[in-house]
Amino acid sequence: MQGALMPLPSLLLLLLGCGPRVSSGGGAGGAAGYAPVKYVQPMQKGPVGPPFREGKGQYLEMPLPMLPMDLKGEPGPPGKPGPRGPPGPPGFPGKPGTGKPGVHGQPGPAGPPGFSRMGKAGPPGLPGKVGPPGQPGLRGEPGIRGDQGLRGPPGPPGLPGPSGITVPGKPGAQGAPGPPGFRGEPGPQGEPGPRGDRGLKGDNGVGQPGLPGAPGQAGAPGPPGLPGPAGLGKPGLDGIPGAPGDKGDSGPPGVPGSRGEPGAVGPKGPPGVDGVGIPGAAGVPGPQGPVGAKGEPGLRGPPGLIGPVGYGMPGKPGPKGDRGPVGAPGLLGDRGEPGEDGKPGEQGPQGLGGPPGLPGSAGLPGRRGPPGSKGEVGPGGPPGVPGIRGDQGPNGLAGKPGLPGERGLPGAHGPPGPTGPKGEPGFTGRPGGPGVAGALGQKGDLGLPGQPGLRGPSGIPGLQGPAGPIGPQGLPGLKGEPGLPGPPGEGKVGEPGSAGPTGPPGVPGSPGLTGPPGPPGPPGPPGAPGALDETGIAGLHLPNGGVEGAVLGKGGKPQFGLGELSAHATPAFTAVLTSPFPASGMPVRFDRTLYNGHSGYNPATGIFTCPVGGVYYFAYHVHVKGTNVWVALYKNNVPATYTYDEYKKGYLDQASGGAVLQLRPNDQVWVQMPSDQANGLYSTEYIHSSFSGFLLCPT
């Protein structure tokens, strides 16, 4: 019985747990199979069980039908999760999130091609970066030669340097040509020196030829030469000068050349004369020096002279009293008359410094007392008040010239000076570089088609383009010029071969060219005076010493002889200038020689040195451009003739001059511009200024 009633609490607990379901759910209890009719019978009382451990209520002893139907029990413990239900309907779209962007997806398939339509031209792009230098292009045609640029203004002449001390030094190495010096005054003509002995014949040197030697003994006359070939005709007349060419366009600027190596340092110049400097201003007084060491006591001086007798009677000297206390400084009394010079007393101990008294009025100078013994050096006093600046003393005597001081540091920039006078208008400057590209403006109206502009400058070489297609087979080119000889091979020297058979005699060759002229021989002895010919005129000398002249021949026409000097032995030259605007104040160096017999003209210096004494004719022809020109023909640093030409703007003018001069051996003749204010001598590679000279007759 007791065992059958044990599950009753469990049934009550189950009923209480299902009560809320029935009241709230409706058909939940019926579905579980718990009918209320089963528990209508009276419930028997059993033993009191233990309180509920899991719930919050306690067992009630009352019949089941007495329970109210609307009573709700305590919520039971949460049950186990049930099975997953079916998915619900989709909810409303939520608010856009702010998450991180997802991984970039794969590219989608290509869309259909768009419609073709002509788009508007976009604005010009900004200039790209400068690309690397491209390969050198094909050689272009030579451009038209431009006009010569304007001549720059001449620089101001420098100050003359001080004359150096003349000391006979050792001859130095050949230095670079120095700057042209100032034109000196012509010196007096020296007396002719004594005639020297004939020296031995030396090798052909580079220096100036020496004086001619004494005439040697007359040699035997040589056999007469073969007659020369007949001439080809008389020389034609000079052609008409061509018309001046049009002004060419200025060529593009050339590529700047590489920087040359620095030249060798020139020899050190002689020391200059000592300069006379202006004595400097008095320096600032230096600080007070330290106290010197105590000197040795000097010798006791002799006693002074006995002074005159005083007016009062001298009293007896009393005993020396004790030193009293230092009293207050008294008022400055009137200056008394100078007393008698007493004997120098013994040096007493150094007293304490009293307070400074009021400055008294300057007294009359007293008599000079005997020199006392040297006292000890006292302590340094306080620095005195700086005195009033004294009047400026008289100028001192000029001091000895001092040595040049070291170069000082550059001074600070001074204040800007006053505005100077307005300068002359300068030359037209070069066109400036391209400016910064401005902002893109609004599109303007369509303008009228302009005229074709001038050809612009060559652009920067672009990048190398892609290789083009292979072209058709080209025509065979012309035969090229023979190349330069290659370097010698490295093969071994072969053994000498056997001698071949003697070939047939060759065809006689054509006569060779005339060889270079040989060195001139020594001058021969003077010939005997020739016979006077009444029918001849003044002509050339014959080898036998006579004068052939121009004998009246057939038809009364003169017949000239061959003469004494041949073309290769006659001193003559012609030199041209290939660069414009040479320096003034020095010989003009006509740097290219067309003919230079006897090598008398030196193109490196522009000076002709006379190799054979005689009468010479000199001529010069110059072009003028940029400014006026003033040219002179110099003989031994003395001007012989002057030529001046006034320049007209826009024209290329010419000037010429000449003179007949008698020269002795080693005399020098050259062309020079005396002033740098008229130095417009112009010459180029194709417009030559020239200088010529030749021997008319020897003396």
Curated annotation (Swiss-Prot):
Annotated stretches, region: Disordered: 66-542
GO BP: angiogenesis; camera-type eye morphogenesis; cell adhesion; endothelial cell proliferation
Residue ranges, compositional bias (Gly residues): 429-438
Feature: compositional bias, Basic and acidic residues: 334-344
Compositionally biased region (Pro residues): 75-93, 502-528
Region Triple-helical region (COL1), residue ranges: 73-532
UniProtKB keywords: Angiogenesis, Basement membrane, Cell adhesion, Collagen, Extracellular matrix, Hydroxylation, Repeat, Secreted, Signal
InterPro entries per UniProt: C1q_dom, Collagen, Collagen_superfamily, Tumour_necrosis_fac-like_dom
Bias (Low complexity): 162-188, 211-220, 261-271, 281-296, 359-376, 440-458, 472-482
Subcellular location field: Secreted, Extracellular space, Extracellular matrix, Basement membrane
Domain C1q: from-to ranges: 566-699
Signal peptide: 1-24
Disulfide bridge positions per record: none
Deletion consequences: COL8A1(-)/COL8A2(-) mice exhibit decreased proliferation of mesangial cells, reduced phosphorylation of ERK1/2 and increased p27(KIP1) expression. Diabetic COL8A1(-)/COL8A2(-) mice reveal reduced mesangial expansion and cellularity and extracellular matrix expansion.
Residue numbers spanned by region Nonhelical region (NC2): 25-72
UniProt-annotated stretches for the region Nonhelical region (NC1): 533-699
Domain of life of the source: Eukaryota
GO cellular component terms attached to this protein's record: basement membrane; collagen trimer; extracellular region
Main location: secreted
Subunit structure: Homotrimers, or heterotrimers in association with alpha 2(VIII) type collagens. Four homotrimers can form a tetrahedron stabilized by central interacting C-terminal NC1 trimers.
PANTHER family in UniProt: COLLAGEN ALPHA, COLLAGEN ALPHA-2(VIII) CHAIN
General function of this protein: Macromolecular component of the subendothelium. Major component of the Descemet's membrane (basement membrane) of corneal endothelial cells. Also a component of the endothelia of blood vessels. Necessary for migration and proliferation of vascular smooth muscle cells and thus, has a potential role in the maintenance of vessel wall integrity and structure, in particular in atherogenesis.
Name of the protein in its database record: Collagen alpha-2(VIII) chain
Gene name of this polypeptide: Col8a2
